[in-house]
Design a protein with these regions (language model features):
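Cleavable N-terminal export/targeting peptides
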Residues: 1-29, 172-175
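Short stretches within intrinsically disordered, low-complexity N-terminal or propeptide regions
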Residues: 15, 20-24, 40, 98, ...
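Short glycine/proline- and aromatic-enriched beta-strand/turn motifs that initiate or cap beta-hairpins
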Residues: 23-74, 163, 169-175
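Extracytoplasmic loops and strand-loop junctions of Gram-negative outer membrane beta-barrel proteins
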Residues: 30-34, 77-81, 148-149
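Solvent-exposed loop/turn segments connecting transmembrane beta-strands
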Residues: 34-47, 87-89, 117-127, 152-161
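Gram-negative (and chloroplast) outer-membrane scaffold detector with strong preference
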Residues: 51-144
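Gram-negative outer-membrane beta-barrel domains
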Residues: 121, 129-175
Length: 175
């Protein structure tokens, strides 16, 4: 009976230690992200970013973005190299906060709120960014993600841009 009480106390202490220990899987990790996507109307988007994850999969993202809007060539009547690459393009630098709203075993989803500034090769342009990221955790910390994004453009030719981006996240190994 005495041995049973000792074992019971040891098991209880072990269970309390397991419950009281905080899990730090992927907290405070950094990633390099690259994504490409299609945006309405007639646009393509490429984003390179650094993401710093804080507690509970919330994250800060610092990004560089390039957007190109193509159109038909007026003389040829179809899309040409010049009407694709030289029609309207913007680049921008920005920051976004991404609070986690959904978690599963190997997936999580985050809202994305941010702002950015850049140029359309003629003048200063700004954006208010809103969206949703869905992330799937792969081996060795890599992640695959898709993102629904909407941008409110300030001082640009587009008022709204919305679309879908797909990309991957590479862990940097730093915490």
């Amino acid at each position: 009976m005495k041995t049973f009480n000792i074992i019971r106390k040891q098991l209880l202490a072990l269970m309390l230690m397991a419950v009281a220990t905080a899990g730090y899987a992927q907290n405070n990790s950094n990633r390099i992200n690259f994504g490409v996507g299609a945006l309405y109307e007639r646009g393509f988007d490429a984003t390179l970013s650094v993401e710093h994850e804080t507690k509970n999969h919330n994250a800060w993202e610092y990004f560089a973005n390039y957007y190109i809007k193509y159109d038909k060539d007026k003389e040829a009547g179809h899309i040409t190299m010049d009407s694709f690459w030289k029609n309207y393009r913007t680049w921008g630098l920005g920051v976004a906060y991404k609070p986690c709203v959904y978690r599963a075993k190997n997936a999580y989803g985050s809202l994305r709120f941010g702002g950015s500034m850049g140029s359309d090769t003629d003048e200063l342009v700004g954006w208010v960014n809103v969206g949703y990221d869905q992330n799937y955790v792969l081996r060795r910390g890599w992640q695959l993600y898709w993102q629904v994004k909407s941008d409110l453009c300030i001082n640009g030719k587009d008022l709204f841009r919305t679309g879908v981006v797909i990309g991957f996240k590479i862990p940097t190994g730093s915490r």
